[in-house]
């Protein structure tokens, strides 16, 4: 693969420091007319190493997703009370540092407050609650949040609607209604559907494709598709991924890579896995940069120090592009090298 000799040299020391002569990813991304970003951790401004965290974030990225601060349990903790303060801090940091904000998420089956899940609702009651939530949150951030994950993970791995509180009580039309309400609250926002395990052509991505196709044929305002891309350490079928992006693009959708990471087993050869990780990230970026429908590529975090992977997948980790000490990893350099090559081709 093109670029691997340089990559192998980088692997000799496993990591390298970022030098003043090096071009940050966001600068290259802007020249390529794409956004590159990350999901910001909870209260990152209060971390013991907050200064370093923010220094790297604003240097490298031009799009930010609040990881948890816009989810129901945080932003709507009581039926008649909204708490915007945690999310506001993320938005303020992003806008101050010339990043756009990707809102996450308006409708999901997880991280719901007890007042919502602790009792039964009629269809009409739940529709009213959902409408109030979507319109209130989107209106609050109107003009400041450019992209919204309106509906998140509404489809099961088997390719059917997920049996969530929304689907059981309202039916599949909750997806359509949430999109319509979001567009009413901010006509200029980019509205997307976001999900995992849909990067390749499979039963789940087929269902999502047909669902979105039907929504667009009905005139429902859906602008894009979000591929989370929490990638298995063995990688993905690149040809299937490429064709999948192409068919969603043919629907007229903008494409967003929203939550990417790629961990690996911690008990094996670190050098080998770092090399494979760099190869996988480079190939994914190459496919994305070759598709003009892809508007942003975001990681679920950026430093291994605060990655979610070790806490959820025992024995796995090192999923992101900076190590625990904020040193750029081989995958960082592989991505940067590819972006530089793409610029030379233009």
UniProtKB/Swiss-Prot annotation:
Keywords: Carbohydrate metabolism, Glycosidase, Hydrolase, Polysaccharide degradation, Signal, Xylan degradation
The protein's name: Endo-1,4-beta-xylanase B
Chain's gene name: xynB
A Pfam match: Glyco_hydro_10
Enzyme Commission identifier(s): 3.2.1.8
Nucleotidyltransferase recorded as keyword: no
GO biological process, one term: xylan catabolic process
Family label: Belongs to the glycosyl hydrolase 10 (cellulase F) family.
Top-level EC class as recorded in UniProt: hydrolase
Signal peptide boundaries: 1-19
Organism: Thermotoga neapolitana
Keyword Hydrolase in annotation: yes
Active site residues of this protein: 153, 259
Domain GH10: 41-338
PANTHER family tied to this protein: BETA-XYLANASE (PTHR31490:SF88), GLYCOSYL HYDROLASE (PTHR31490)
Catalytic activity as recorded in UniProt: Endohydrolysis of (1->4)-beta-D-xylosidic linkages in xylans
Molecular-function annotations in GO: endo-1,4-beta-xylanase activity
């Amino acid at each position: 693969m093109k670029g691997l000799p340089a990559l192998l040299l980088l692997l000799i020391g496993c990591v390298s420091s970022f030098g003043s002569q090096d071009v940050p990813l966001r600068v290259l991304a802007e020249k390529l007319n794409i956004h590159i970003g990350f999901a910001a951790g909870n209260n990152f401004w209060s971390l013991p190493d907050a200064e370093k965290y923010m220094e790297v974030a604003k240097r490298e990225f031009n799009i930010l997703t609040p990881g948890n601060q816009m989810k129901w349990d945080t932003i709507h903790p009581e039926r008649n009370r909204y708490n915007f303060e945690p999310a506001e801090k993320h938005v303020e940091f992003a806008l101050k540092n010339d990043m756009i904000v990707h809102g996450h998420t308006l409708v999901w089956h997880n991280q719901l407050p007890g007042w919502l899940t602790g009792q039964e609702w009629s269809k009409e009651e739940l529709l009213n609650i959902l409408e109030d939530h979507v319109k209130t949150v989107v209106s609050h951030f109107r003009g400041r949040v450019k992209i919204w994950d309106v509906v998140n993970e509404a489809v099961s791995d088997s390719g059917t609607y997920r049996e969530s509180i929304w689907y059981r009580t309202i039916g599949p039309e909750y997806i359509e209604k949430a999109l319509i309400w979001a567009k009413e609250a901010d006509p200029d926002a980019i509205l997307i559907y976001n999900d995992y395990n849909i990067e390749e052509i499979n039963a789940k991505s087929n269902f999502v494709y047909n669902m979105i196709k039907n929504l667009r044929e009905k005139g429902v305002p859906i602008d894009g598709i979000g591929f989370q891309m929490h990638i298995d350490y063995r990688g993905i079928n690149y040809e299937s991924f490429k064709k999948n992006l192409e068919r969603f693009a043919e629907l007229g959708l903008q494409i967003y890579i929203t939550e990417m990471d790629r961990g690996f087993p911690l008990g094996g050869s670190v050098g080998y896995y770092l090399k494979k990780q760099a190869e996988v990230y480079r190939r994914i970026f190459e496919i994305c940069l070759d598709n003009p429908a892809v508007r942003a590529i975001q990681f679920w975090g950026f430093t291994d120090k605060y990655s979610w992977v070790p806490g959820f997948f025992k024995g796995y980790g090192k999923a992101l592009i900076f190590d625990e000490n904020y040193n750029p990893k081989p995958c960082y350099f592989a991505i940067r090298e590819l972006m530089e090559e793409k610029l030379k081709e233009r």
